[in-house]
From Swiss-Prot:
GO terms for cellular component: cytoplasm. It is found in: Cytoplasm. The lineage of its organism: Bacteria, Pseudomonadati, Pseudomonadota, Betaproteobacteria, Nitrosomonadales. PANTHER family: FAD ASSEMBLY FACTOR SDHE (PTHR39585:SF1). Transmembrane segments: none annotated. Its main location: cytoplasm. Belongs to the SdhE FAD assembly factor family. An FAD assembly protein, which accelerates covalent attachment of the cofactor into other proteins. Plays an essential role in the assembly of succinate dehydrogenase (SDH, respiratory complex II), an enzyme complex that is a component of both the tricarboxylic acid cycle and the electron transport chain, and which couples the oxidation of succinate to fumarate with the reduction of ubiquinone (coenzyme Q) to ubiquinol. Required for flavinylation (covalent attachment of FAD) of the flavoprotein subunit SdhA of SDH and other flavinylated proteins as well. Pfam families: Sdh5. Keywords: Chaperone, Cytoplasm. The keyword Chaperone applies. This is FAD assembly factor SdhE. The gene is sdhE. The keyword Cytoplasm applies.
Length: 77
C-alpha cells in the first residue's frame, strides 16, 4: 500500500462530515502537498475526531498555528 492509499485509509473516520472533508482534501490537494504539509496532515489525523472537526470548523483554535498551511486547504473543502 503506497503512502497516499494509507493516508486515504486514515481519513476514514467515525464522523460522516470528517470523512467527506478529508476525502475531498486527499482528492484535491494530496498530490500538491510538500513534505512538511504531509507531516502536518498526518499530525492532524492523530487527533480525535471531535478535536479535529472543531479545529477545521473553527470552534477550537489550535494552540500555536502550526497547522495553518494544511488547515487553510482543509477549510476550503
Amino acid at each position: 500500500m503506497n503512502h497516499q492509499a494509507r493516508m486515504r485509509w486514515r481519513c476514514r473516520r467515525g464522523m460522516l462530515e470528517l470523512d467527506i472533508v478529508l476525502q475531498r482534501f486527499i482528492d484535491n490537494h494530496y498530490e500538491q502537498l510538500d513534505e512538511h504539509q504531509l507531516e502536518l496532515f498526518e499530525m492532524l489525523l492523530s487527533l480525535s475526531d471531535h478535536d479535529l472537526w472543531n479545529i477545521i470548523i473553527g470552534n477550537t483554535k489550535e494552540p500555536n498555528n502550526q497547522f495553518q498551511p494544511v488547515l487553510k486547504l482543509l477549510q476550503e473543502n
